[in-house]
C-alpha cells in the first residue's frame, strides 16, 4: 500500500481542517487537493466514489441550497447524472475524502480518517 495519502478538500471547511490536523498529528504524509482550484473530472470523482464503495447519492451534500432546489436528494437520477452535476457544482460534494492506495474514506466525522492512518 502506498503510504502517501491524498485529501480532497475545501480549505474553508471546518471538517476538512479538523481532518488535516488529525493527519498532521499522526505524522502521516499526504497531499491536499483543493478541488475548487484543481477541479475534479467526472472520471476522477467516479473513481473516488468507487473506492468509497458507496452510491454517488451518498457523496451528495443534500442540504446544500442547490441540491434542495434541484431536488437531488429525492432520487430519480442515475449515479452518472449525479456525478456530472457534482463535478459542475463542487459545493455538492461531501468532504473531505481521504484516499490511500485503493481505499478511500469520507471523513465525516473527521475521526474516520484514523481508518487509514
Where are the predicted features?
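Local sequence-structure signature of Cys/Sec-based thiol-disulfide redox active-site neighborhoods
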Residues: 2-26, 30-35
